[in-house]
Amino acid sequence: GETISIYYDPGKFPALMPLKNGNYEERNGGVPQRGNITIHLQQFNEDLDKMTPDKNFGGIGVIDFERWKPIFRQNWGNTEIHKKYSIELVRYEHPKWSESMIEAEATKKFEKYARLFMEETLKLAKKTRKRAKWGYYGFPYCYNYTPNNPGPDCDAKAMIENDRLSWMYNNQEILFPSVYVRHELTPDQRVYLVQGRIKEAVRISNNLKHSPKVLSYWWYVYQDKMDIFLSETDVKKTFQEIVTNGGDGIIIWGSSSDVNSLSKCKRLREYLLNTLGPFAVNVTETVN
């Protein structure tokens, strides 16, 4: 769009792509330490030209890359395969090493090249679309209300790791934390989830010389119940948390599956007109 462009999995980041039979296929080496940066950047440049041909694009550019995290430890769940594969590569190369030595080497190699890919991608975006404001979706991560960290505060290790990602944040004009809430949480927990994530993003921003803006990704359905729109109370309280804790704005996100039928379109239109729209206007006027 003219105001905001979201680039989903752009370029050719190294990744292990899941196949229908349960196996994985290597894309550009599979993991950062085996990837070809030139191939990736060439493809990323082509993707930019295709999606945003206007070199004077002055809007917001969001790079939405979620195949793996640049912090080795944080690759769990869907991204854990990259961690396991990296460990196996070192084990194959050094069969006599201890497990701790193998993991340390895998961590070092992975994080070195993960940084290379993510940093050079940002730099190329900024070089070719100088007027746009760039950043990666989801960062900084907080991991509050997760199985290993069930409270409102961000995971202590993740906060230290966020400080280690200053190389990324120094190249971003905007931070894009995700504040999607879950139905399984209590109303108060939903508020605290948003509060914790905004506070961490603002903390990171305040620690940087150029103080990037904090624009939160907010979804109008519950992450674990995608057929239920956020209640009026949840809309009001989550918006208020973003504003009162130092957030600079909100990106209201939606999935194509939210509008893939006539009945869904009608439901969303009604929700926008009666619930979300009026409150969004109210918050905008208050902030301005």
Swiss-Prot record:
It is found in: Secreted. GO terms for biological process: carbohydrate metabolic process; defense response; hyaluronan catabolic process. It comes from the Eukaryota. Disulfide bonds join 142-154. The active site is at 66 (proton donor). Its EC number is 3.2.1.35. It catalyses: Random hydrolysis of (1->4)-linkages between N-acetyl-beta-D-glucosamine and D-glucuronate residues in hyaluronate. GO terms for cellular component: extracellular region. PANTHER family: HYALURONIDASE (PTHR11769:SF35). Belongs to the glycosyl hydrolase 56 family. Hydrolyzes high molecular weight hyaluronic acid to produce small oligosaccharides. This is Hyaluronidase. It comes from Polybia paulista (Neotropical social wasp).
